[in-house]
Amino acid sequence: MKKQNNLRSLAAQAVEQVVEQGQSLSNVLPPLQQKVADKDKALLQELCFGVLRTLSQLEWLINKLMSRPMTGKQRTVHYLIMVGFYQLLYTRVPPHAALAETVEGAVSIKRPQLKGLINGVLRQFQRQQETLLNEFATSDARFLHPGWLVKRLQNAYPTQWQHIIEANNQRPPMWLRVNRTHHTRDGWLGLLEDAGMKGYPHPDYPDAVRLETPAPVHALPGFAEGWVTVQDASAQGCAVFLAPQNGEHILDLCAAPGGKTTHILEVAPEADVLAVDIDEQRLSRVYDNLKRLGMKATVKQGDGRYPAQWCGEQQFDRILLDAPCSATGVIRRHPDIKWLRRDRDIAELAQLQAEILDAVWPRLKPGGTLVYATCSVLPEENRDQIKTFLQRTPDAALSETGTPDQPGQQNLPGGEEGDGFFYAKLIKK
């Protein structure tokens, strides 16, 4: 491989773009993966995800082992050293190879004069590893979460916050959704077993299967033919609560990338579905998902606060609002969220959610169902949001999910091994 495509330096650049520039890893990583051989793509992903998962520990180690931080044009070296620490702590890469490749990464980022520094810091860590890790185990950084988020979780879940943090710091399981228009879940599990893999059904969500060991999608029976889709179990709860019926007019708002749109159509193939999202780029993935599954829906770009712009005066039998949120329930799947979110974002998101709810409620027919969902675990976006909505909306009633005092159903990450998710099912009187 060409030296400029040193795997460790690419990982360092990816993490730097997330932490310093506020970019999403899902946007940063794919173009970098194009620069490496197929056999190295998984390791590059592991290094990026792993460093972001354990960032506060790696930052703590750098502060212990270096007298001053790397700044300016040398900042990438700061993250390159983190990549070195991560390999030594969490991967099966032999230590000598981890050191050699990480040090060589300095050449790829045009900082060859810092090879000695990188080597020295990593070797110092190896010598002091046990002492450093014992000290780290009593530090505030041990939770691997920003302090503001730890405080919010402690306040919201006095007895469960550590469980949530531990779940967030795990690698996520791989969940699939069996397309019931092609196979029963048990039937597809048989095909999976024939292919030499094992899966387990979810007790509550009828299409959900957890793979014993994550696998590339091309290895899954019938993936290209639309027999199965990658989707977390908790996300599948949206269509379960929505309970779409054939012939109904259904709005899927904030629909990209289309996993819930296609699930609605698997449950009710004759439903008339409008999928709307504000992000035109992400809508391309809705089209891709519909095409792979051989389904049809109307897809439009639009802002949920202004429905007149994308549906005129149309009303719907059912509305799924998968609201923009902090995504604090899916941190194990997207560890960059911990470092992209800020404490002040929560109030802004709650305000946006309230505006969308108020704007779209008049578009629900009397007797119709609206499912409000987020992949957050924070009450400001979930129970508190629905509680205040019910107080100001006299023709809205809660159904199936919770009580007026504690509205909605909150799934915590790791519960039945799904992501953190919230649902509130509302009926228009």
Curated annotation (Swiss-Prot):
Catalytic residue positions: C375 (nucleophile)
Molecular function via GO: RNA binding; rRNA (cytosine-C5-)-methyltransferase activity
Top-level taxon of the source organism: Bacteria
BP term (GO), one: rRNA base methylation
Catalytic activity: cytidine(967) in 16S rRNA + S-adenosyl-L-methionine = 5-methylcytidine(967) in 16S rRNA + S-adenosyl-L-homocysteine + H(+)
UniProt keyword annotations, A-Z: Cytoplasm, Methyltransferase, RNA-binding, rRNA processing, S-adenosyl-L-methionine, Transferase
Enzyme Commission numbers on file: 2.1.1.176
Stretches of the chain forming a coiled coil according to its record: none
Disordered: region residues: 397-419
Record PANTHER family: NOL1_NOP2_SUN FAMILY PROTEIN _ ANTITERMINATION NUSB DOMAIN-CONTAINING PROTEIN, NOP2 YEAST -RELATED NOL1/NOP2/FMU SUN DOMAIN-CONTAINING
Purpose of the protein: Specifically methylates the cytosine at position 967 (m5C967) of 16S rRNA.
Family designation: Belongs to the class I-like SAM-binding methyltransferase superfamily. RsmB/NOP family.
Protein name per its UniProtKB record: Ribosomal RNA small subunit methyltransferase B
Organism: Salmonella heidelberg (strain SL476)
